[in-house]
């Protein structure tokens, strides 16, 4: 049931809270490609590191690959992220994701525009739907460059319509007579 994973939000660990609170007006970006993809070829990772070093936003990246010797100070790399808790923070600007169902519902629930990199399965369809609604942009992991990544991030951050449309989509999604867990319970009991 869409959004069942959105209800509970926990306080961030102290180091993450300090990192995101210290992002100032520029805010921060969350980047994760889901639980199945936590690394990428070094050449591709370099393009992401090069792009991130050029933006004022801080970046929280779920990544287990090799780090550059000159890791930019605006990037915090972690093996695991409390994704929903971070997406609920008021300074979040963009959610960079592969477009898995779990993650997109967390992004929608929290009203966060997305930059999406579909990799397999239903992700392509999920991404297509959000791009069509004007709340996300799509890049191909195979073709992305430092320049295309920078352009997409700047577009989403600077064009306020992405955030406005996502907040509208979020309010529609959250406006329901039963919360997702209540709905699941109702239908489970109904069929029994």
Where are these regions (language model features)?
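Catalytic core of nucleotide-sugar-dependent glycosyltransferases
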Residues: 1-192
